[in-house]
């Protein structure tokens, strides 16, 4: 937001959030090597149960902080998180494609690609290529990027598939390959064809108890990615009536301010790039005029 507008308060938000991530969210000491340098999962009490997994470690924000401030701790923290991700990926949890949900290795890939783009250090690439290969095996064995939920249940979780698609797309932009492009299109086609309710909106998860409206903006980014890859506007028209709801939720106007009911800073960070990416695609195609705002 600061880069687009020059409004200082957005930079202040970045600095405060990045310093919190660097000082509080990252493990600075532990006898467990799988924790050192990694980012705690956001849980009650900040690190209840001491959980650390690839799906809850992010580096792009602290890299942005490094670029805006010159504070080398930003880059150092990003590298330490990346090193932690590399160690976690060598654990049994990630050994077999399909035994962890798509967002686990999806978020890991996104972090590692960002670190490669920033540093050009090829140490990040080996696991990137391993993750890409695991997604290919996953699709071949299960038909799609299904997520394990019980010992005998595999389901679609659209937003988790979208995490994977967004991360694979970031790799594709650096290392374009036709097989990766086609794998992405198939994954997003699966979301469009199988992850919607009768009302035309995406569902949360493919379980009867969780098959409710899902407005995670990562789903919109996946549609924009499919449009970028194919030029077909049908992807942008899918679920277009959910766009306004996903963007603003409930809101009220007070004087010249629009107040949106609260979400976490993580929620904002996760939503901003998907919304802007989708909005740009709608603007480029003229479909923005079809969006209903709530």
Identify the function of each model-found stretch.
Residues 1-201, 205-228, 232-294:
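Catalytic cores of extracellular degradative/oxidative enzymes
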């Amino acid at each position: 937001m600061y880069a687009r507008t020059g409004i200082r308060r957005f930079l202040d938000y970045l600095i405060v959030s990045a310093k919190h991530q660097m000082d509080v969210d990252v493990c600075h000491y532990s006898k467990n090597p799988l924790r050192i340098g990694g980012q705690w999962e956001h849980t009650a009490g900040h690190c209840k149960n001491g959980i650390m997994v690839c799906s809850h470690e992010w580096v792009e924000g602290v890299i942005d902080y490094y670029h805006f401030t010159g504070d080398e701790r930003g880059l150092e923290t990003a590298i330490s998180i990346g090193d932690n991700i590399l160690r976690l990926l060598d654990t049994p949890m990630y050994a077999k494609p399909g035994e962890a949900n798509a967002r686990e290795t999806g978020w890991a890939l996104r972090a590692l690609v960002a670190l490669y783009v920033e540093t050009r250090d090829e140490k990040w690439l080996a696991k990137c290529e391993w993750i890409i290969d695991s997604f290919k095996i996953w699709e071949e064995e299960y038909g799609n990027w299904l997520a394990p939920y019980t010992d005998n249940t595999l389901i679609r979780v659209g937003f988790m598939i979208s995490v994977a698609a967004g991360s694979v797309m970031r790799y594709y932009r650096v290392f374009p390959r036709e097989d990766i492009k086609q794998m992405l299109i198939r994954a997003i086609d699966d979301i469009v064809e199988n992850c919607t309710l009768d009302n035309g909106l995406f569902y949360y998860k493919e379980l009867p108890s969780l098959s409710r409206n899902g407005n995670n903006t990562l789903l919109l980014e996946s549609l924009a990615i499919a449009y970028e890859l194919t030029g077909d506007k049908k992807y942008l028209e899918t679920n277009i009536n959910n766009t306004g709801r996903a963007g603003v939720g409930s809101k009220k106007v007070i004087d010249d301010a629009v107040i949106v009911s609260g979400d976490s800073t993580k929620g904002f960070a996760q939503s901003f790039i998907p919304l802007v990416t989708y909005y740009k695609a709608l603007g480029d195609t003229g479909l923005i005029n079809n969006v209903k705002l709530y």
